């Protein structure tokens, strides 16, 4: 079974972690801070198909997860009703809602959103997401027009279209926000109930789901509110890894480094071996390409769109205007453009930072608009990894270059090739300078670097999710943007030729200096401070990678220790700083 943070025993504080405190058969993540867990007892690492998922904004825990819950519910409901009437054809949840059988439709469906989902669900479009799932749409493939049209459709017709048929639905009556009720298992909980009769008699199906961050969903399997039992909701391609063997098992960075040392593999190579144990190399590469392409397309879309972001804060999009200014400055160095005369000119040694900021802003503005993005590892932190990937393919490095003690792969054909200024497109990057050609063999090398980046980032993301959390509602923004920064730093260090120890160090630096970040979105929208915070974190990740690459990999604080510290810090953090919009900026900034 794919290991999920929710499946692990509760980790102990650092002072309590000793090998003799755990049963021999347990692979408690925190235990290995003081010793190794045998590979036979270790959990299956999360896959790239788990850590990077294509979905829609603005939140992985409050939008993508609830949408998956709705889709799972409508699929089970369709199967149940099909069994009642002997019609097996009704058991396919992915078919078009228009194909539902009217006679089999329930007379009422109710949705209850608890805890953080109830507190910030309107700003995160949680209600809309659940309805889209119930209508049979998946976050990976739903069209944006469909997303924006679900509320008007229900309001105009009074019905929710589902694979089971048209269900009478009143948005104000049948969706209840219950922020003051926090269920025991997780703060992000929702219950969906289907009734055969409109007056609430004869319940057909009811499930409680927990959206635990990053689009991961757990479903409660019993009715005990005080002792809930849950199972992972496997959806899509990630389901293929359940119970699948993995040649390299690790739940900690200590074990990961041990496996790398024993095998002689780099982190990206080790993760690839695990992936190819259950899929072909072509399938792995195609998925990595799809993830990278979607990230690039998101940057391209964000730099092409203007206007005001939805939600009522009247936050203007900035990426398009910034892209225009930077592109013009890169071409001409024109001093009449807005901004300091030297900024991002060919002579500006910090010009890469402006482009990294642009890439992050573009992605997170798309996310805030509810458009398609890659959960990396969450939607609220979706701009960090694409921005650092942009730095990799735009500014790192010339052939034969070295950074610190690491020997970087050659990404350009010519050792004299200058740093390229680029914009992203559906086919990758478009260079704004004629001095560098990234096609042909150079692009093949660049593609491998991108793949290595994502594979190494997956390893770090798996460690964080396994041992702590990537959900802002559990541990604050340190678990979202902090995790993304650690993943991006590790990916960049790997792509630039870092040793496993340097890669681990890069991730540790980025996470250590993200500790304590609160999640306090104004008006419950993933806009302020989220959009700018992604840009800051992307630059931090680059700095962390560069610092690590100048070292020999030896450092005082381990990645395992900083992940456990992040978990403890999140546990100690007041709930008003964990995606409830009840503290911090959310109460000190006027919503206008």
Give, region by region, the residue ranges found by the protein language model.
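Functionally critical mobile loop/hinge segments
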Residues: 113, 485, 490-592
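Alpha-helical support elements that line or immediately flank enzyme active sites
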Residues: 61-78, 386-398, 443, 489-497
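Accessory "access/gating" subregions that flank catalytic or transport cores
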Residues: 281-403, 431, 438-476, 584-592
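Flexible, glycine/charged-enriched surface loops at secondary-structure junctions
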Residues: 82-88, 100-106, 144, 285, ...
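Conserved phosphate/anionic-ligand binding catalytic regions in large, soluble enzymes, centered on
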Residues: 52-72, 370-388, 475-486
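C-terminal regulatory domains involved in ligand/effector binding and gene-expression control
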Residues: 138-342, 353-355
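Beta-strand segments within the central parallel beta-sheet cores of soluble alpha/beta enzyme folds
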Residues: 83-87, 100-115, 402-404, 410-413, ...
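Intrinsically disordered, low-complexity terminal tails and inter-domain linkers enriched
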Residues: 6-38, 82-102, 399-444
């Amino acid at each position: 079974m794919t290991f999920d943070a929710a499946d692990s025993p509760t980790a102990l504080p650092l002072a309590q972690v000793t090998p003799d405190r755990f049963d021999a058969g347990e692979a408690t993540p925190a235990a290995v801070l003081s010793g190794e867990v045998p590979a036979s007892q270790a959990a299956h690492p999360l896959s790239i198909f788990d850590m990077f998922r294509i979905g829609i904004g603005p939140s992985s825990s409050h939008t993508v997860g609830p949408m998956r819950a709705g889709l799972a519910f409508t699929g089970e409901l369709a199967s149940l009703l099909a069994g009642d009437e002997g019609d097996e054809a009704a058991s396919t949840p992915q078919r078009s809602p228009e194909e539902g059988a009217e006679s089999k439709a329930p007379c009422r469906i109710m949705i209850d959103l608890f805890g953080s989902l109830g507190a910030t669900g309107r700003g995160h479009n949680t209600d809309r997401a659940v309805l889209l799932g119930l209508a049979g749409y998946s976050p990976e493939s739903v069209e944006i027009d469909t997303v924006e049209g679900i509320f008007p459709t229900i309001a105009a017709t009074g019905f929710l279209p589902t694979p089971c048929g048209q269900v009478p639905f009143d948005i104000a009556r049948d969706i209840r926000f219950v922020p003051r009720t926090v269920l025991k298992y997780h703060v992000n909980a929702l219950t969906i109930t289907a009734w055969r009769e409109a007056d609430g008699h004869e319940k057909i199906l009811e499930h409680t789901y927990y959206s635990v961050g990053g689009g991961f969903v757990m479903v409660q399997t019993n009715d005990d509110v005080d002792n809930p039992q849950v199972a992972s909701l496997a959806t899509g391609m990630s389901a293929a890894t359940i119970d699948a063997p993995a040649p390299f098992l690790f739940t900690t960075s200590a074990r990961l480094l041990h496996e790398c040392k024993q095998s002689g593999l780099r982190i990206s190579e080790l993760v690839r071996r695990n992936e190819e144990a259950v899929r072909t190399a072509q399938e792995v590469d195609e998925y990595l390409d799809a993830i990278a392409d979607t990230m690039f397309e998101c940057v391209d879309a964000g730099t092409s769109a203007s206007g005001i972001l939805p939600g009522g804060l009247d936050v203007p999009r900035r990426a398009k205007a910034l892209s225009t200014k930077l592109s013009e400055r890169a071409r001409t160095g024109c001093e009449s453009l807005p901004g300091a005369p030297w900024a991002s000119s060919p002579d500006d040694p910090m010009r890469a930072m402006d482009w990294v900021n642009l890439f992050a802003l573009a992605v997170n503005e798309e996310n805030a608009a509810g458009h398609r993005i890659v959960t990396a590892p969450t939607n609220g932190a979706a701009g960090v990894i694409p921005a650092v990937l942009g730095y990799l393919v735009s500014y790192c490095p010339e052939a034969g270059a070295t950074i610190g003690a690491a020997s970087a792969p050659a990404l350009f054909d010519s050792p004299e090739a200058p740093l390229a200024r680029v914009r992203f497109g559906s086919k990758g990057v478009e260079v704004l300078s004629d001095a560098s050609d990234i096609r042909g063999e150079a692009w093949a090398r660049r593609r491998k670097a991108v793949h290595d980046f994502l594979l190494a980032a997956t390893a770090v993301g798996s460690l964080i999710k396994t041992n702590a959390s990537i959900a802002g509602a559990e541990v604050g923004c340190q678990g979202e943007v902090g995790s993304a920064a650690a993943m991006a730093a590790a990916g960049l260090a790997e792509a630039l030729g870092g040793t496993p120890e340097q890669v681990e160090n890069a991730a540790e630096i980025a996470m250590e200096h993200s500790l304590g970040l609160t999640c306090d979105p104004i008006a419950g929208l993933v806009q302020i401070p989220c959009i700018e915070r992604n840009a800051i974190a992307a630059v931090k990740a680059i700095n962390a990678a560069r610092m690590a690459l100048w070292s020999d990999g030896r450092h005082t604080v381990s990645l395992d220790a900083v992940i456990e510290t992040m978990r403890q810090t999140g546990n100690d953090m007041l709930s008003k700083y964990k995606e409830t919009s009840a503290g911090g900026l959310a109460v000190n900034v006027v919503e206008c």
